[in-house]
Amino acid sequence: MQTLSNGTRAHEYLANLSDLIQLISGLFMPAFFFVSGLLARNAIIDRPWKRIATSRMTNLFYLYLLWGAIQWGAITGISTEITGQRISQNINAAYAGTFSEFLTLTFLAMSTSWYLYALGIYFLLAKLFQRYNLPLLLMAAVLNYLAVEKIIPYWGPQSLAQYFVFFMLGTFWCSQILRLSEWRRQNGLPWLLLLLLAGLPALFDFDRSLFLSVLAILISVAACRGLNQVSSMAWLNWIGRHTLPIYVLHRIFIEYFGMTAILFAQRHQLFALAWFSWLWACLYPLVIVALCSLASVAVWSLTNHGVGRALFRFPTLIKRPAYPAA
């Protein structure tokens, strides 16, 4: 009975941890797309179509399709080899049962690497309508509301609609956001106003506030600025340079290491042990993230040579310097 109680508490802890991760992810993604828009700003505003069509949009769509197919094949193979059956019912291109289902889910951005698809679409729209950036921002804000309230169906289209507004802010209003993120007296009133606006949607039972996401962006920028003042941030820069291989490869390693570890623990009835359940609940998320990240970088280091470079960069860009950027 005591073992069952401990196991239940560990399960509740994992459930609460999952909810926390979902909340953090919901606030992290706006910051990611804001920074992506900031980095794409010069290409969108100053560079001609001829110079950026392949290096930006074509490259992003190419990587999205390529790694979507690789993940689908690898995850299907891993699931079949280890369990002999499909164990996930997630609506995701990586778990598609047929080729037509894979294509449909990929087109709908219901793929693990959906953010590559989103960046390509955002870049295209921002470039096309850069002279009408304010109306485009307002449209993006409306799309954000429709996505958050799930008026737009399916999680893939919802994701595409939800984060466009933050890419727009990074592209066309980054200077204002960066100034607002500084700890200055004159920024006190705007911050207070944002705090009030961030809490207002709760009165109307909205799922998530656009203003709360903007606050998360400001806090993230301010935190990074503060850390950069007291540390070299070399480790964070290293992670940033390897974001693409870590992101596209980690899903495959999560399936392999995760399923292998879970099946091993079940086979030896380790989850019946209270100490193991708590150890698993506390350490597994950290260990699996570190293990998958290191494995992803290792594979990238081994394959990012010669023809293998086409796994991470559109073939016609291989001879050009610079790592694929958002």
Description of each model-found segment:
Residues 43-51, 131-132, 174-187, 223-238, ...:
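Membrane-interface junctions at the ends of membrane-embedded or membrane-associated helices
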Residues 9-16, 91-105, 267-278:
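Juxtamembrane membrane-water interface segments that cap and precede transmembrane helices
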Residues 1-6, 73-76, 252:
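Alpha-helical transmembrane segments of multi-pass membrane proteins
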Residues 22-31, 43-80, 90-106, 238-249, ...:
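Transmembrane alpha-helical segments and their boundary/interface "anchor" motifs
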Residues 1, 68-69, 139-152, 191-205, ...:
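Aromatic-anchored segments of alpha-helical transmembrane domains
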Residues 17-29, 103-117, 149-169, 199-219, ...:
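Interfacial loop-to-helix transition and helix-capping segments at the boundaries
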Residues 120-143, 172-190:
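Solvent-exposed interhelical
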Residues 205-309:
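Alpha-helical transmembrane segments of multi-pass integral membrane proteins
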